[in-house]
């Protein structure tokens, strides 16, 4: 039996050695057809041209996990139609003592994901809840930036990749 895409992303998030200065650890896993295409993690003290272009907070001094995942493959793979699963966990999170929290992509990350054609973002809300953001039909804010609404929220047990 195949693992759900959310479980796969949680495993990647728990296996990574994060910078000790980070209060929360964020992992973004891009999937196409149920296969892992790229994995990105938040890092402290770095920035990227892609992130500078889209950022909404001038004081942000880290690469966000979603941006890192896109940067890893943006010149190698067409991400149109892909999904991203974003997991945020506290440092003392474990399978026996889960501490998953809100990982909704920020406005900057939403714009990056939309620009590269990703269709959906699934993200943790709590240990037992997740949100789903449709990235294909944006509203525009007063600055012309895309903004997306969540269309579902539910139990983590239903996060199978329905495209397979």
Residue ranges and their predicted role:
Residues 1-164:
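Zinc-dependent deaminase catalytic domain
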């Amino acid at each position: 039996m195949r693992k759900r895409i959310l479980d796969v992303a949680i495993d990647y998030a728990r296996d990574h050695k994060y910078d000790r200065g980070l209060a929360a650890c964020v992992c973004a896993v891009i999937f196409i057809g149920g296969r892992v295409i790229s994995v990105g993690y938040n890092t402290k003290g770095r920035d990227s041209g892609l992130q500078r272009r889209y950022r909404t907070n001038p004081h942000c001094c880290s690469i966000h996990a979603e941006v890192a995942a896109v940067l890893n493959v943006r010149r190698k793979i067409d991400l149109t139609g892909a999904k991203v699963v974003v997991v945020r966990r506290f440092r003392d999170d474990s399978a026996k003592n889960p501490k998953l929290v809100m990982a909704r992509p920020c406005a900057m990350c939403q714009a990056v994901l939309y620009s590269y054609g990703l269709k959906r973002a699934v993200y943790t809300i709590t240990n037992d809840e997740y949100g789903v953001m449709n990235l294909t039909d944006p509203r525009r804010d007063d600055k012309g930036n895309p903004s997306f609404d969540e269309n579902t929220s539910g139990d983590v047990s239903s996060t199978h990749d329905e495209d397979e």
